[in-house]
């Protein structure tokens, strides 16, 4: 089961990296309606792990020093969306992905890997769409099988199949410094 979770984490992490390098043409262009990430207010979305509140674009080094050694290991790769390296920390049931900004490691995404953990609002993998909407409201975008909520510089993504949560992530909304993907 652990091997399966690690494989799923690797696939999801690769998907997040590739999404940063790909087109977002399936999402509506709301650029006129919303300020760019650097001008946005702080996000209301966060995730708590081992009593530590994790927020996207927060200090990844601080978070990982408090969380300790990741049980599933650590991986890094040259970033195709940001300067420097992308970093992946595989904790029980949660994957943290980091990126470098101005020479500092920042938290890019938090991905919940199984139903052992839940959001502060009580939503976990396996819950129905009705529970997501009840917890987070109806102000979401539905695209590519996902329910997408945005607040400040954070996108909360629920991947759905048959109206059931398959995966959920908090992702930092930012403008990549330059794309180096092929």
Regions found by a protein language model. Name each.
Residues 1-5:
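Positively charged n-region of N-terminal signal peptides that target proteins for export
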Residues 41-48, 108-117:
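Acidic/histidine-rich, surface-exposed loop or edge segments in extracytoplasmic proteins
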Residues 24-69:
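N-terminal, intrinsically disordered, polar/charged segments of Gram-positive cell-envelope systems
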Residues 48-54, 116-123:
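Second-shell loop/turn segments in exported
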Residues 62-102, 124, 129-170:
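A cross-family detector of function-defining hotspots
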